[in-house]
UniProtKB/Swiss-Prot annotation:
Keywords of the record: Glycoprotein, Membrane, Phosphoprotein, Signal, Transmembrane, Transmembrane helix
Name listed for the protein in its UniProt record: Cell wall integrity and stress response component 1
Entry superkingdom: Eukaryota
Annotated transmembrane regions: 293-313
Localization terms from the record: Membrane
Positions of glycan attachment: N278, N284
Signal peptide: 1-29
Membrane topology: Single-pass membrane protein
WSC domain ranges (all copies): 31-119
Keyword S-adenosyl-L-methionine attributed: no
Location of Phosphoserine modifications: S354
Organism: Schizosaccharomyces pombe (strain 972 / ATCC 24843) (Fission yeast)
Coiled coil feature spans: none
Amino acid sequence: MVFLNSSPFKGRLLFFVYLLIISTRLVAADMNTQYGCYLVDSSLTEQGTFTYLDPAYCYNNICGGSDNIAFVAIRNNQCYCGSTLTATEVSSSLCTTPCPGYGSLMCGGDLYWSVYLTGNGVLQTTVSSSSVSSTTSSSSSSSPSSSSTTTTTSPSSSSSSSSSSSSSSSSSSSSSSSSSSSSSSSSSSSSSSSSSSSSSSSSSSSSVPITSSTSSSHSSSSSSSSSSSSSSRPSSSSSFITTMSSSTFISTVTVTPSSSSSSTSSEVPSSTAALALNASKASNHTSLNAGAIVGIVIGCVAFAVVMALCIFLYFYFRRFKIRMSDSANEGKYPSYASELDSRLDPAMMNRKSSESLADSQDYSRKILRVTNLN
């Protein structure tokens, strides 16, 4: 004890703890490793786009580098960020689109997000109350008879029994309602009784206003009782942490309160409609880009063909005119015809006094020239 209380040992211990915290923070803040691949839904809002996008640029420049941001999600060149992740995780092999300019990093795909942790804030995963009820029912029906399940859910403003409880007879339904209301009143009367009930069912949960515990002695009865148990007291909290445990499975789930829990079996999650909408938008976006590229290529080819045709016609008609002019000049006398001997044309012959008279009978004879003998 004296050694532990010594000042040098305390200083070294604090220094070691400080180094451990710093190294953990640095490892957590490494955004070069993909945390997971998730299906695109409407839970996140696009913050911006960039041609050469990577996780660090998305966090620092587009999302502002806030300490409350726990993760960034990238879809092609679109940046998303937040602290609560509600999307469905899928296989990492579906996020195969490399980041532009960063071939070693993946940037999701047309319908998938690549999620990277920033090392700040607290990463939370949330599901709806109906999803937790259905998960509880399915896990109870598949678990052995000795297992038990404790589910902590947030109270909703209006609640009714689900499809499994409504399909039972009216007498069993009323008895189930009375038993659940008595359980609710007993759990709300004292927090110690609810905590003891939670510990006896071999499950641990965080402190919340209302806790409902269900033991599965048989698969069908466990499913009906777990799906029919609900609370009606309103709460101001927006989310609750639930821990479900069995002999081999432990999971922590944050439950989001829903406005109404009636007819949960016929309720369609909003993420499905959002997924279909995003898929149609992505297909339209891809088809528009492909159509624009094809149109540009066809336009360039057509312009080149028209220009080549115009050049060909120009030279063709030019040679045609030359040939036509040559053929038109073939029947005419040559231009040098007027340069012949004028004696062959008496009308054009010049009559000079110094020359002899022209012989109009025979042009083949020599023309005598008169000379002065004196």
